[in-house]
């Protein structure tokens, strides 16, 4: 008996099988490791890799595609990568580096990828943001007009900083750069400002000290610490500042004021130089790659004061740069000076002479901050920079001149007292009312008959006297931030009263 198969039956069976076929075809962009070492991997394949794309290695290590060359891809590793070998498989993820952000980050210490490193458990992020985000455009911004008080009299009076400004802190090692940044964070208590402190390439013990100081002062309640220590791969040290900016950006677009400190960008540039040289990119001046300016400009341009339509948020950036023997004309210092809206220059000579904070008012400048200075401070601080500059000139001249006229002697005496009252202890920021009172006393001659070595005692006593509430001045200036006729009259009365008691007890 012959079996006859009809063609239409065959076609219907095939059609049925085709319709039931549901196996998914997975297309993956895969490559093979050609060479690995020093935190760099060269990979064959990955034809469709994007610049900056995250790559996943066999052992779970993540890398970033940096060099897209004709026959291979150069990638930097974001981990030790000890298990990666020649011939290992690499898969392109199709994603760009991003981190989790949200309120849960406040009070925590995280690494450059936003992972908790403080032993307090995982962080439940509310959303993800790209580490490399575009900076706000021209229309999205408005000019800097609100003060960002550092609590340091020398800075708030002569080099004022506004919300949304980029102000560089520059100086040799051990001149108090980090101390100024930490004081500024401590001074934001009660101001509804979210602070982000980014430690790049620092010793773990140094970062632990900073966190401890912030905890003791109650500042970790509004601060996030991003740490990429000296033992971390260069890739993470390079990424850490962008992570800090991304965390601050989340709060900025929610309408909050934020403050980011990058401590310090010299080490970030060195990490980028290391990555670039190992990737065989051509070196330029001081062996830095040609785009080292761009890594800092795209970071610092993300700091802004947003327009009213975007919620009035702000990101103030205080980048720190370390100089070698006071040389501000080196490559990285000049780059960052040209990007920022001013610089606070700390001098090792002043520091060693006991003038702390060691701010050099001669070459320090704030290009936009004066528009943000409080009215009370503007009224008293106008003359101080000029007086100190003239004092420096006279002091140099007085070393050679034996007989000085009375006016010159008086000006020298006034200058010495002004310099003395600008001295301030670490981790003790002052309120606006305290700063205004001290400066007013110095400029209007209340200290002229006080011995130079007693000026610090006088100013401390004056601050305590004003805060005791005997006089209405302190509360009025603290709330209004102006120094009107009534406040000035109250301040004069307070100064006269306190000076009498000080002279009687001295």
Swiss-Prot record:
Compartment(s): Cellular thylakoid membrane
Xref: PROSITE patterns: ATPASE_ALPHA_BETA
Swiss-Prot/TrEMBL catalytic activity: ATP + H2O + 4 H(+)(in) = ADP + phosphate + 5 H(+)(out)
Record keywords, A-Z: ATP synthesis, ATP-binding, CF(1), Hydrogen ion transport, Ion transport, Membrane, Nucleotide-binding, Thylakoid, Translocase, Transport
Main localization, broad class: membrane
GO CC terms, sorted: plasma membrane-derived thylakoid membrane; proton-transporting ATP synthase complex
Keyword Iron carried by entry: no
EC number: 7.1.2.2
Site (Required for activity): 364
Gene3D superfamilies referenced in this protein's UniProt entry, alphabetically: 2.40.30.20, ATP synthase alpha/beta chain, C-terminal domain, P-loop containing nucleotide triphosphate hydrolases
Binding site for ATP: 171-178
Domain of life: Bacteria
Main enzyme class: translocase
Alphabetized HAMAP family for the sequence: ATP_synth_alpha_bact (MF_01346)
Known function: Produces ATP from ADP in the presence of a proton gradient across the membrane. The alpha chain is a regulatory subunit.
Family: Belongs to the ATPase alpha/beta chains family.
Assembly and binders: F-type ATPases have 2 components, CF(1) - the catalytic core - and CF(0) - the membrane proton channel. CF(1) has five subunits: alpha(3), beta(3), gamma(1), delta(1), epsilon(1). CF(0) has four main subunits: a(1), b(1), b'(1) and c(9-12).
Name recorded for this polypeptide: ATP synthase subunit alpha
Organism: Trichormus variabilis (strain ATCC 29413 / PCC 7937) (Anabaena variabilis)
Lineage start: Bacteria, Bacillati, Cyanobacteriota, Cyanophyceae, Nostocales
Originating gene: atpA
């Amino acid at each position: 008996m012959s079996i006859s198969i009809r063609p239409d039956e065959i076609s219907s069976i095939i059609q049925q099988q085709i319709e039931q076929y549901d196996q998914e075809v997975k297309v993956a962009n895969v490559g093979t490791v050609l060479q690995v070492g020093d935190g760099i991997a060269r990979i064959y394949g990955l034809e469709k890799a994007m610049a900056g794309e995250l790559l996943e290695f066999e052992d779970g290590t993540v890398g970033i595609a940096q060099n897209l060359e004709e026959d291979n891809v150069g990638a930097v590793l974001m981990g030790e990568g000890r298990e990666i070998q020649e011939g290992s498989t690499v898969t392109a993820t199709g994603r760009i580096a991003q981190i989790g952000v949200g309120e849960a980050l406040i009070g925590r210490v995280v690494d450059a990828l936003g992972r908790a490193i403080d032993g307090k458990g995982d962080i439940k992020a509310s959303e993800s943001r790209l580490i490399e985000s575009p900076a706000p455009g021209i229309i999205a911004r408005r000019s800097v007009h609100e003060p960002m008080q550092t609590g340091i009299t020398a800075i708030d009076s002569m080099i004022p900083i506004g919300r949304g400004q980029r102000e560089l802190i520059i100086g040799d090692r051990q001149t108090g750069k980090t101390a100024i940044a930490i004081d500024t964070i401590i001074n934001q208590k009660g101001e509804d400002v979210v602070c982000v402190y980014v430690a790049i390439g620092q010793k773990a013990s140094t970062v632990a000290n900073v966190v401890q100081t912030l905890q003791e002062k109650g500042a970790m309640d509004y601060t996030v610490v991003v740490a990429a220590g000296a033992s971390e791969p260069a890739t993470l040290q390079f990424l850490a500042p962008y992570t800090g900016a991304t965390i601050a950006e989340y709060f900025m677009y929610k309408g909050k004021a934020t403050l980011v400190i990058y401590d310090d960008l010299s080490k970030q540039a060195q990490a980028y130089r290391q990555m670039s040289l190992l990737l065989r990119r051509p070196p330029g001046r001081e062996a830095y790659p040609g785009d080292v300016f761009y890594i800092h400009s795209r970071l610092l341009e993300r700091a802004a004061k947003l327009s009213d339509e975007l919620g009035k948020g702000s990101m103030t950036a205080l980048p720190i740069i370390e100089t070698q023997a006071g040389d501000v004309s080196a490559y990285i210092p000049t780059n960052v000076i040209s990007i920022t809206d001013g610089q606070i220059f700390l001098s090792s000579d002043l520091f060693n002479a006991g003038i702390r904070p060691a701010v050099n008012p001669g070459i320090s400048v704030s290009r936009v901050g004066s528009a943000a200075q409080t009215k009370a401070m503007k009224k008293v601080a106008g003359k101080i920079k000029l007086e100190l500059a003239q004092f420096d000139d006279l002091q140099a001249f007085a070393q050679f001149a034996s007989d000085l006229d009375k006016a010159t002697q008086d000006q020298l005496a006034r200058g010495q007292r002004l310099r003395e009252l600008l001295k301030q202890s670490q981790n003790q920021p002052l309120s606006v009312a305290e700063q205004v009172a001290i400066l007013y006393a110095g400029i209007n001659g209340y200290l002229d008959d006080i011995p130079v070595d007693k000026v610090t005692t006088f100013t401390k006593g004056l601050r305590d006297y004003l805060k005791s509430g005997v006089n209405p001045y302190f509360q009025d200036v603290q709330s209004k931030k102006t120094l009107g006729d009534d406040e000035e009259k109250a301040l004069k009365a307070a100064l006269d009263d306190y000076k009498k008691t000080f002279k009687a007890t001295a």
